[in-house]
Amino acid sequence: MVDIYGLVVALILGIVEGLTEFLPVSSTGHMILVSYMLGFNNDKTKIFEVLIQLGSILAVIIICKQRWFLLFGLNLKKWEIYQHNINHGSRLHLYHIILGLIPSSILGLMFYEQIKSFFEPKYVMYSLILGSLLLLISQLIHDKKPRATCIDDISYLQAFLIGCFQCFALLPGFSRSGATISGGMLVGVSSDAAFEFSFLLAVPMIFGATILDLYRHLPVLSLDDIPMFIIGFITAFLVALITIKLFWRIIKGMSFIPFVLYRFLLVIVFYLILI
């Protein structure tokens, strides 16, 4: 029998995921808090929140496919929304992505169980505050004349350091995009370049986390869960695709201050709800 309420929850969480995945506000944090409000907080919740992120990642792969083809030494017709930033003699390649993945991959595997224990609303609120402080610091003290003005200028060391900042995002509520963009700005990368590099890092990072969660939680899942996962996945994909296409250039040039204020407001709202 189809669980109508479960499908509605999946639809809502898919919308939340698609809207927030690439903003520095933490999509995982939003989904945990919204899941709690909707009463969807059983053993399957944690893996569902990771699985539907694949929908957003598919949207990124489609929109950024030219860059991915170049990373693998291939070429494709030029039509991406940020195509003007792509140099077909690109100096960015897979080594940059691998270096950016190493720190968080190691810590994620070593402390998997401990990290999952933080998937609770109260910890999300703490992480939202900490992530806001990093966003604020990077906004105030970043280099006004960055050494890497476009994504192809990012060095191996900068890629690795951005990956180190990504480790903060292992805490739900911190924001993976917020951590990587802020980290990039603090190590001499322009906000535009850090934003694009954050997009590329998201694909293997979230895909790897999903595979690991599936492996760990497979016994908890059943065939009855498939419709809910499909609804969440498709919704997240479509909403993320629309959001990225509409707001790519706007988000890249924005100050972090509105996001910092939003995150603090979100903490206050959910604190009042949870007490």
UniProtKB/Swiss-Prot annotation:
The gene is uppP. It is an enzyme of class 3 (hydrolase). Belongs to the UppP family. Its EC number is 3.6.1.27. Keywords: Antibiotic resistance, Cell membrane, Cell shape, Cell wall biogenesis/degradation, Hydrolase, Membrane, Peptidoglycan synthesis, Transmembrane, Transmembrane helix. The lineage of its organism: Bacteria, Pseudomonadati, Pseudomonadota, Gammaproteobacteria, Candidatus Palibaumannia. InterPro entries: UppP. The chain crosses the membrane at residues 4-24, 54-74, 92-112, 123-143, 154-174, 194-214, 228-248, 255-275. One of its GO terms (biological process) is cell wall organization. Its main location: membrane. Bacitracin is thought to be involved in the inhibition of peptidoglycan synthesis by sequestering undecaprenyl diphosphate, thereby reducing the pool of lipid carrier available. Catalyzes the dephosphorylation of undecaprenyl diphosphate (UPP). Confers resistance to bacitracin. This is Undecaprenyl-diphosphatase. The keyword Iron does not apply. It catalyses: di-trans,octa-cis-undecaprenyl diphosphate + H2O = di-trans,octa-cis-undecaprenyl phosphate + phosphate + H(+). One of its GO terms (molecular function) is undecaprenyl-diphosphatase activity. One of its GO terms (cellular component) is plasma membrane. It is a multi-pass membrane protein. It is found in: Cell membrane.
